[in-house]
Every structure is written in structure tokens, then in C-alpha cells.
Amino acid sequence: MKEFIINENEAGQRFDKYLGKLLREAPKSFFYKMLRKKNITLNGGRATGNEKLSTGDHVKLFLSDETFGKFAGVQETVARAHQKLDIVYEDDNILLINKPVGMLSQPADDKEPSLVEYLTGYLLESGAVTEASLHTFRPSVCNRLDRNTSGLVAAGKSLTGLQELSSLFHDRSLHKFYRCLVNGVIKNEKYIKGYLHKDEKCNKVTVQETETSGALPIETRYRPLEDNGTVTLLEVELITGRTHQIRAHLAGTGHPLIGDYKYGRRTLNDEYRRKYGLKSQLLHAYRLEIPEIEGRLSYLSGKEFTAPLPYLFQKILKEEHVEENK
């Protein structure tokens, strides 16, 4: 027999929808049959599956371990927190994590763990989630960064947090700021627009000034913080959030990111690689500003969160004399 107590993440849905998540490999006919035979009960009584679940409801499944395991499906291996996460902020609904360079934001295949698996491992170890609760709700990230871009990634710890924070990212309510080091000298703040087209085969984008079929509109704002006569430290506000937007948009203006071999200048990148061991673009999701918002996350209104630059990024800024001074 298996017993489950409905939590806040599971409440509000129909009982049959919940069972469909819990017994993901079972045909609907199976759990309707089990409901009729009272092999599945709700609060100790017979149920039809149409009931709306409430927090604290008791669900019992009078099934063998073998049957439950068969229909619940094999749970993928959770990567425990072998790599300690840099938690910038955490409450009952959300987390903000400072993702390091080299870590995937979301799973790309079955072999390499991503931030999602590390997050799940962290929450399991802290007791915030259980193996049982993961059958029906899995915490996940609300935004993605490229593997070799570091900085703030937001995650939903509860269903409310995941849904509402994802919505804020989707409708561009949040203000997202990056730090990057680019080739060339930039003296003035600028707002730039364009159209981005992605080549799925080579995972590379191009930016054009005029609209073409399949291209998506992009908007970027940047302001210089410091330069040394050769390179410039920028603060970039990502207004839209397209694939490789900052990297391709700045490269299109003649100021590619240092370390970016996909869109940048190999000769200069090789110089930084020899000098500092730099293998990827110097781009960091630095600050997240939350405006006045309504709903369950309204307590976050007006808050601002920052993630410190990685050590190598800081070292290069210091050695190249482009540390921020304003």
C-alpha cells in the first residue's frame, strides 16, 4: 500500500489528473478501474476521479510495489549536489542561483547533469521536497543561460513560484542586466534593435536590421562602465531574450565579446586564452530587478538581486584595468 498526502503544489487539480501524473505509465482505464474497486481511495472513501483535491487530502493506493513501480515509471537519476550551488536568494516559492560557467541550465541528454538535477538534489537534501512529491511536481528553472554564460538563474521551488515567475520572464516584466567585456571602445549608452534568425543546424544566429521571414525582433540596451582603450566593460539590459542575443547583437555592431569563439574574433580570443586560460565568452547575468507585481509573489515587488562575477572574470578586469568605477 502506498499513501500520499496532498500538498500545496498538488491541490486544486482533479483527482484523475493527479493520478495521471502519479501513475504516468498507466492507461486511464486502469486507475478508473482501481477507483471503482476501491483499490485507490481518497480520504478513506470511494472516489470517481472528478473530485478537486485540497491540501491535506489523503490518497491511498492498495497496489503491490511491483505494480506501483511499473505504472509510476522509472524515475530518472537525480544528480545529488556534488557541486555546491551558489544560492543568491531562497524562500518557499523561488530560488535564485548563481550558475557557474560550464553548467547546463536544463538537461540536454541523459548523461550530463544540469542545474535542474543539481537543484533537485539540493532540495531533496534540504528536505524541501521528497521522492514522493517529485512524482507529481518537479521544481525547475524559469530562465536559461548558455552553458558558458554565468550568473543568475531563477527557479520555481513551488508550483506557484514556477508558474508566476515563468510568466514574469515570458511577458518581459523583469529587468535583466548583464556584464560583458567586448572588443573595442564604446563611450556612449545605446539602445539597439534588430531581427534575429537562428540556424538550427549549426546552433548559430544572425542579426539583421530589416525583418525577414522567420526572424524574431530583438531589443538590447547597453552602457559602458569602463574601457582601457582596447576593450570595454559593458552593462547590458536584455529587453528581449532570444538565443545568443547579446553575443550576436554586439558582434553585429563591431564589438564582439571577448572569449566568444562563435561570434567573436579568434586572434584576440586566442590572446586572452594564452594569457588567462579563458575558454569562453565573458558574459555574466549580473542583476535582476523585480518591478511592482501582483499575486502570490507580490512580496518580491521592488527587490533587486545581484550575482558576483566569477573569479576569472574579475581577474581579467583587474589585469586589463577595466574594473568598474561608476
Located regions from the model:
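Well-ordered beta-strand positions
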Residues: 88-89, 146, 197, 223-226, ...
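Short, surface-exposed secondary-structure edge patches
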Residues: 48-52, 235, 280
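Pseudouridine synthases involved in rRNA/tRNA modification
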Residues: 1-33, 65, 80-85, 212-219, ...
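RNA pseudouridine synthases
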Residues: 1-201, 216, 308-320
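Short histidine-centered loop motifs in beta-beta connectors
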Residues: 44, 229-230, 234-237
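Short beta-strand segments enriched for Tyr within beta-sheet-rich domains
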Residues: 165, 242-250
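Short aromatic-glycine motifs in intrinsically disordered, low-complexity regions
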Residues: 203-213
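Conserved hydrophobic positions within beta-strands
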Residues: 182, 221-224
